[in-house]
């Protein structure tokens, strides 16, 4: 190859100079800017600045001095070609265009090309190997090299090609798949296919990274696809979990457990007597292990229920021999002499009862009043003939009655509705009048009858008085007659 380059160099050299001058003013579509190209060269660590741009930094000068033979792809050359006034700098400029196959392209431009279009391709990676133009072997590059340099290039290429070839072939296959994927892209169209494609690409990238751990593989993230895959996984996971549990299923097995029943039975046996505990333990042993919910609940309530059976007691109120005539809801007041005011005793049911007397069978009545709720006795008095009763107002009656607390006669006020007050007043008035008439009759019956001798003496005395009066009258009349007789004789 060195001999071939030496033979073609004088024939092709002028055309190469003219071709690079015209080519230097055009930029490839894959490159973004001269600054971006220079940054990529800096990141690669093999940057060789052109002579036209004068750098003042020490880094560029040190790199320019220490730079030897460097392999750079011709697609990464940016900027204009050197002017025609500097022909001596042309060989150094031509050192950047080196014969290099497509499999040996640097990986760093691929990372830059993926970061820019990632937002537009919806996460589908487009490596720089696919977008950038493929390098071709030009005879001009061979003509610009010296025989020693071309020999060194061939030696280095032979050493580096076997190391990069497997990875390069995988990248070429991966590039062809990714070129077919983003063609005619519409947002949201065939989203499932893209998910599958990304999964396949990820698997291929994993295989490549496992084969070549030193190579840098870009990771394209698409949040829409991640959300769809995570939601699908969650849906399947929730569906699997929902089929496992059903509410209310096998409730008897969950509620009924033999240890808990034994504990409950032991508690009840402690509270009950020894005889009851023995009977319950025998019944539990005879009972089957698995019972229904209703049966177990009935057995539990029966075991824990305390049957408090009270003896029936006959209620005695003292009104068993009486007949109720009238009962009303009212409020009772008592007159306090010290404070000269009415004090409430309580409210409840006032009953008017009639009863037969044991002595002579006469009718007697009494008033009984108990408080509502507690049934405490607050009034218990009999009706008598000298009992005073008057109607204080349309809804109240004032009576005198015996007090059950101090057994003295006090003045009470009964307050109720107008209808109940009228009925009570009429019933009390009728019974009090009957008691008064009966009392008068008793008094007349109890008075002693007059004696017969005494009546005769009185009659004789009366007759004597009449006789005494009669002679005096007669004598008076005789004298009068005598006077009359004397008078005419005298005349």
Curated annotation (Swiss-Prot):
CDD domains: RanBD_RanBP3
Comp. bias (Polar residues): 111-124, 133-149
InterPro entries, A to Z: PH-like_dom_sf (IPR011993), Ran_bind_dom (IPR000156), RanBP1-like (IPR045255)
Record keyword Phosphoprotein present: yes
Main location: cytoplasm
Residues annotated with N6-acetyllysine modification: 9, 21
Modification comment: Phosphorylation at Ser-58 promotes its import into the nucleus.
Keywords on record: Acetylation, Cytoplasm, Nucleus, Phosphoprotein, Protein transport, Transport
GO CC, alphabetical: cytoplasm; nucleus
Compositionally biased intervals (Low complexity): 275-286
Domain RanBD1, residue spans: 302-442
Disordered: region residues: 1-177, 255-292, 438-491
Pfam families: Ran_BP1
Domain of life: Eukaryota
PANTHER family associated with the record: RAN BINDING PROTEIN, RAN-BINDING PROTEIN 3
Record text on subunit structure and interactions: Interacts with CHC1 in a Ran-stimulated manner. Interacts with XPO1. Interacts (via its C-terminal R domain) with SMAD2 (dephosphorylated form via its MH1 and MH2 domains); the interaction results in the nuclear export of SMAD2 and termination of the TGF-beta signaling. Interacts (via its C-terminal R domain) with SMAD3 (dephosphorylated form via its MH1 domain); the interaction results in the nuclear export of SMAD3 and termination of the TGF-beta signaling.
Name under which the protein is recorded: Ran-binding protein 3
Native source organism of the sequence: Mus musculus
């Amino acid at each position: 190859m060195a001999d071939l380059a030496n033979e073609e160099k004088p024939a092709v050299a002028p055309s190469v100079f003219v071709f690079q001058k015209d080519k230097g003013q055009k930029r490839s579509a894959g490159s973004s800017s001269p600054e971006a190209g220079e940054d990529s060269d800096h990141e690669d660590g093999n940057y060789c600045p052109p002579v036209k741009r004068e750098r003042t930094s020490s880094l560029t000068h040190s790199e320019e001095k220490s730079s030897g033979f460097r392999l750079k792809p011709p697609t990464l050359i940016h900027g204009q070609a050197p002017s025609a006034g500097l022909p001596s700098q042309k060989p150094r400029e031509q050192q950047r265009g080196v014969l290099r196959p497509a499999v040996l392209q640097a990986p760093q431009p691929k990372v830059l090309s993926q970061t820019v279009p990632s937002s537009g391709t919806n996460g589908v990676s487009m490596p720089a190997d696919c977008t950038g133009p493929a390098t071709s072997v030009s005879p001009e590059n061979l003509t610009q090299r010296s025989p020693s340099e071309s020999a060194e290039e061939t030696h280095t290429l032979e050493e580096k090609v076997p190391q990069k070839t497997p990875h390069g072939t995988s990248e070429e296959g991966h590039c062809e798949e990714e070129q077919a994927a983003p063609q005619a892209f519409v947002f949201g169209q065939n989203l499932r296919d893209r998910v599958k494609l990304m999964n396949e690409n990820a698997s291929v990238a994993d295989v490549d990274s496992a084969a070549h751990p030193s190579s840098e593989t870009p990771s394209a993230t698409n949040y829409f696809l991640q959300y769809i895959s995570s939601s699908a996984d969650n849906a399947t996971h929730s569906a699997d979990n929902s089929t496992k549990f059903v509410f209310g299923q096998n409730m008897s097995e969950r509620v009924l457990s033999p240890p808990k029943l034994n504990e409950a039975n032991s508690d009840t046996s402690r509270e009950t007597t020894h005889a009851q505990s023995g009977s319950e333990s025998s019944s539990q042993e005879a009972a089957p292990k698995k019972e229904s919910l209703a049966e177990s609940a009935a057995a539990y309530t029966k075991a824990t229920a305390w049957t408090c059976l009270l003896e029936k007691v006959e209620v005695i109120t003292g009104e068993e021999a009486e007949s109720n005539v009238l009962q009303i809801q009212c409020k009772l007041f008592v007159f306090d002499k010290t404070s000269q005011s009415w004090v409430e005793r309580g409210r409840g049911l006032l009953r008017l009862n009639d009863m037969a007397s044991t002595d002579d069978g006469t009718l007697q009545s009494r008033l009984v009043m108990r408080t509502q709720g507690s049934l405490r006795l607050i009034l218990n008095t009999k009706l008598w003939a000298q009992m005073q009763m008057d109607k204080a107002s349309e809804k109240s009656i004032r009576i005198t009655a015996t007090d059950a607390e101090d057994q003295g006669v006090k003045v009470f006020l009964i307050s109720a509705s107008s209808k109940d007050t009228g009925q009570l007043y009429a019933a009390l008035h009728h019974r009090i009048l009957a008691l008064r008439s009966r009392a008068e009759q008793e008094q007349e019956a109890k008075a002693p009858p007059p004696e017969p001798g005494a009546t005769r003496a009185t009659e004789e005395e009366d007759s004597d008085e009449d006789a005494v009066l009669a002679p005096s009258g007669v004598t008076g009349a005789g004298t009068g007659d005598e006077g009359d007789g004397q008078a005419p004789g005298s005349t």
